[in-house]
Amino acid sequence: MQTRKTFSWIKEQINRSISVSLMIYIITRPSISIAYPIFAQQGYENPREATGRIVCANCHLANKPVDIEVPQTVLPDTVFEAVVRIPYDMQLKQVLANGKRGTLNVGAVLILPEGFELAPADRISPEMKEKIGNLSFQSYRPNKKNILVIGPVPGQKYSEITFPILSPDPATTKEVHFLKYPIYVGGNRGRGQIYPDGSKSNNTVYNATSAGIVGKIIRKEKGGYEITIADASDGRQVVDIIPPGPELLVSEGESIKLDQPLTSNPNVGGFGQGDAEIVLQDPLRVQGLLFFLASVILAQIFLVLKKKQFEKVQLSEMNF
């Protein structure tokens, strides 16, 4: 009996230890989920500024291409694909937060017209689900269902992202009309250079904060450098801290200028934005167009038949 109680107590302690360890890991691990686009969601009510600039460009300074493909026209209450392509060289490696090299992640923000939103799962076809894969989209804000964000996700697998979109029906949504609408997209690959608070990440170039002579360079145990610069005019010493990641370009005893690069620029990613247009088409207009085309075709057929009949009459009169 005592042995059974002891075994039960040991089992309980082991389970408790595992639970505590798991909680500590979840809290302290460097999760990519706290990266973009959460920064934009926390800092900006709308991801697109009045100038047309998407706010992701404030932290991702390099300009890179992005492409979007949507149908020219869609009917009300239909599901269609918005395909966003974020091209980059898959062989590239980026500097991670710990200074090591790793693969690039990608992310995207899709700004749809009012009324357009993410298609519900039961409206998505199996073919479209296969294109989407394991991606999980979310609204930029609970009250902004027309703005969708995704990422960061592995770039090698998702450099092409398929958004399933549901078009609105003006019959039930009075704010929507049968018009041509713009769609805006922003796509990013790799980490940013600046955090929302204005501080630099380790994925950018570091410049000298003072002119003078490089007196001492100390390599830190966990990576990175402390560079002591002695001002040539007054001898004042300034210490510049370089995080792990960027490669050092200066050496001790070297004379440097203010804002001179102390490191290389390790950034291999960047952000791009683009736009497209889509027409929300009235089904009655489509039906009218089809009726008009059918009437034109019938008129052409009757004209040809009438012409052939006339030619036969002429031929019979000539033979007579």
Swiss-Prot record:
**Keywords linked to the UniProt accession:** Chloroplast, Electron transport, Heme, Iron, Membrane, Metal-binding, Photosynthesis, Plastid, Signal, Thylakoid, Transmembrane, Transmembrane helix, Transport
Localization in the cell: Plastid, Chloroplast thylakoid membrane
* Cofactor(s) the record lists: heme
How the cofactor is bound: the record states: Binds 1 heme group covalently.
- Which annotated residues bind heme? Y36, C56, C59, H60
> Tell me, what is an example of a GO biological process annotation in this record?
photosynthesis
Q: Name one GO molecular function term.
A: heme binding
Give a yes or no for keyword Signal in this entry. Answer: yes
Q: What is this protein called?
A: Cytochrome f
InterPro entries noted in UniProt: Cyt-f_TM (IPR024058), Cyt_f (IPR002325), Cyt_f_lg_dom (IPR024094), Cyt_f_lg_dom_sf (IPR036826), Rudment_hybrid_motif (IPR011054)
- Parts of the chain that traverse the membrane: 286-306
The family line of this record is: Belongs to the cytochrome f family.
Q: What GO cellular-component annotations does this UniProt entry give?
A: chloroplast thylakoid membrane
How does this polypeptide assemble, per the annotation? The 4 large subunits of the cytochrome b6-f complex are cytochrome b6, subunit IV (17 kDa polypeptide, petD), cytochrome f and the Rieske protein, while the 4 small subunits are PetG, PetL, PetM and PetN. The complex functions as a dimer.
Q: Which gene encodes it?
A: petA
Indicate how the chain sits in the lipid bilayer: Single-pass membrane protein
Signal peptide residues are: 1-35
Summarizing the function annotation, the protein's role is: Component of the cytochrome b6-f complex, which mediates electron transfer between photosystem II (PSII) and photosystem I (PSI), cyclic electron flow around PSI, and state transitions.
**Main localisation, per the record?**
plastid
